[in-house]
Amino acid sequence: MARRRKGRPIDGVILLDKPTGITSNDTLQKVKRIFFAQKAGHTGALDPLATGMLPICFGEATKFSQFLLDSDKRYRVIAKLGERTNTSDSDGEVVETREVKVDRGQLERCIAKFRGTTDQIPSMFSALKYQGRPLYEYAREGIEIPRESRKITVHSIELLRFEGHEVEMEVHCSKGTYIRTITDDLGEMLGCGAHVVYLRRTGVSDYPMENVVTLEQLQALRDQAIEQGIEPGELLDPLLLPTDSAVQDLPEANVTVEGGDAILHGQPVKASQLPEQGTLVRITVGEQRDFIGIGEIDQNNMVAPKRVMANKQDEA
């Protein structure tokens, strides 16, 4: 007999403002406990040093978390020139100190070289896996693992402030871009070394930063609910964004109620005004535009289901 999953079966996305000094997974577990959720997962780890937007998906939304993992990110970073560390941030040990002889013009010319699509070699102090273990575990043991470079795209990188040995920048980049690595590479270009002292993620996909909430705010709502003798979910759940917010960038394919039933049973259906073959679409049903999953336009110009909502299948 299958063991019953502990927690509430809730669906949706919460935009957490991750605090510094804690891992993304520890943050996830705290949020999961506050909501008493059955199932939850985050959508792209932030370094312990980093703060900012960490979308956490609950229940059915976890099926679509890959779209947030693959989406563009935005960051605000402050780098310190003159010191290089083994982790490329201030959590590591200083391994080299050099004199800083940099003017603003030189700095802006070097920053400009990061714009566009380039190859980046991930840091050893990253969560990328090698033989089932994250690279940072090998790094802590003094083991260097060969890493292949990966294509990244920096859509924009702007210098906001240059004071003394501090450089503040704003970066809009593709998934898999390591800001620590950009900072370390910038320091080497400038000939003085550099490392990250502050990093804040200010955007994931098109989610607005004003929707983020802190752990303290969530805990306060839970405590308030308990004090008032009501279910914590009554105060917490209104903060959840809808499940389909994770796939908001996909074009919509609106099908009839009958078509929706067919989709939920694994059958492709016809719909009007569809994009070209091979395009992933967000499937909605009827005039209410109720989200039921994602599909792909097949060779017959029909909407073929790829991933659908289990709770909608139960209703179909």
UniProtKB/Swiss-Prot annotation:
Its annotated function is as follows: Responsible for synthesis of pseudouridine from uracil-55 in the psi GC loop of transfer RNAs.
Q: Which PANTHER family match?
A: PSEUDOURIDYLATE SYNTHASE TRUB1, TRNA-PSEUDOURIDINE SYNTHASE
Which GO biological process annotations does it have?
A: mRNA pseudouridine synthesis; tRNA pseudouridine synthesis
Organism the protein comes from:
Photobacterium profundum (strain SS9)
MF terms per GO, please? RNA binding; tRNA pseudouridine(55) synthase activity
Q: Kindly indicate whether the keyword tRNA processing belongs to this entry.
A: yes
Q: Which family does it belong to?
A: Belongs to the pseudouridine synthase TruB family. Type 1 subfamily.
Q: Name one Pfam family in it.
A: TruB_C_2
Identify the catalytic residues: 47 (nucleophile)
Name the NCBIfam families on file: TruB (TIGR00431)
Taxonomy, superkingdom: Bacteria
- What is catalysed by this protein? uridine(55) in tRNA = pseudouridine(55) in tRNA
- What's the protein name? tRNA pseudouridine synthase B
- SUPFAM superfamilies reported for this sequence: Pseudouridine synthase, PUA domain-like
The enzyme's E.C. designation: 5.4.99.25
- Keyword terms, alphabetized: Isomerase, tRNA processing
